[in-house]
Structure formats: C-alpha cells, structure tokens
C-alpha cells in the first residue's frame, strides 16, 4: 500500500479508538449570523447546505431521530460501529449556552455515540462556550471544526463570510489552549484566488495551530449567489 505524504483522517481516527467509528451528520436547527440579519441576510455566496446534508439529516426531526436513522444506514455495513454526532449544518455554536448544552447532550445520550464534532464559525465562540466544550472534552471525544475558508481577508469579504482570518486565528488559539482537538476547513479555488495565492496561504494555514485540516475544492452550486456571479463573470 502506498504511504501517503500526510496523516489522513481515516488513519488518524483509527488510532483514537479501539473500534470503528463513523460520523453521523445532524441538523440541529441552527442558523448563521450572515443569514439571520446580525451580519447579513445573504449567507456565504457559495453555500447551499442541502448539497452536503444526507437524506436522514433534517431539522424537522429530533437530534436523536436523525442519529438513529444514520445508525440504521451505516449499521448495514458495519454492525459493530460506534458513532460521532457531527453537528454540520450551519453554525453549531450560534445559540445560547443552554441551547448548546441541550442539543449536544441529547446527541451524546444516544446509544453507541462516543463523541461529537462541532462545525462552526470562528466568530461564534466565546469563553463561556469554549469552557463548556472543554468540560465535555473531559467526558467524551470532541472535535471543533472552524470554517476558515481562506487566509485572504479580501476573499472573505467577497464571499460574504463576515469575519476575518485574524478572527479564525484567535478562535483556533483559544480552542487549542483548552486542549480541544481543533479542525479547520478551507476552499481551494475561491474567486480571486489562483494557484499562487493558494500556495502563499499554505504556510499561513499550517502555522495556525490546527490539528485537522479539511481542504475542499471550489464547487459552484446552481442557485447560489456565486453561481450567478460566475454566469455573469466567469473566474
């Protein structure tokens, strides 16, 4: 088998558990500050949550129902599987602390769930929320994943993120200080960014302190603002 030049997530996660684990996506009913009017109402120009949400993942169902349906789907292949509840849709720390506690702990109470993965924005965590997540981290497996998207503030403005890269660095620092496994997402090929710009950002992202990095290719989804921009002015 060819040895990869990096530590891929599959090999890494297998070393964390004595059993096979699978993430189950959950839509816990959150929104985003650039959707609900606090920062904007338009959302990120590239985003359509429906494109990465499994069929069992629906906010009209309870968190427990979504996880149980996800378990039924994956158990057909691996009956002895354990699970990580993946709070994936929208911004999963954008709510009151009590709301977060209720939702996270509902997921953790489901049989065979051994941890949670929290997808969020770097401008939607504070000391109180991070302290609570750090406490959870003492009791179960926790990953916090930040949507960084780019280290270029002009790009972040152009795609209507509503935060800066400096905000991402600060959130990563505070999360890491609490001993929480910290991940980040970036997108290659955002408007205005070519190969040289991606290579310029690589050491900047690398030095941010992340434990996990997910690299996505740019996808232009029909119906998004970015699709309209691309139709009018291809990049």
Positions of PLM-derived features:
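N-terminal [4Fe-4S]-dependent radical SAM core
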Residues: 1-84
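Acidic (Asp/Glu)-rich catalytic clusters
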Residues: 74-78, 103-111, 131-141, 173-177
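Short acidic, glycine/proline-enriched helix-loop-strand junctions
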Residues: 225-235
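Core AdoMet radical
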Residues: 50-70, 74, 78-97, 112-125, ...
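Short amphipathic alpha-helices and their capping/turn segments at secondary-structure boundaries
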Residues: 70-74, 125-139, 170, 199-209
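Active-site mouth loops of central-metabolism enzymes
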Residues: 35, 89-97, 189-196
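Conserved C-terminal portion of the radical SAM core fold
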Residues: 166-225
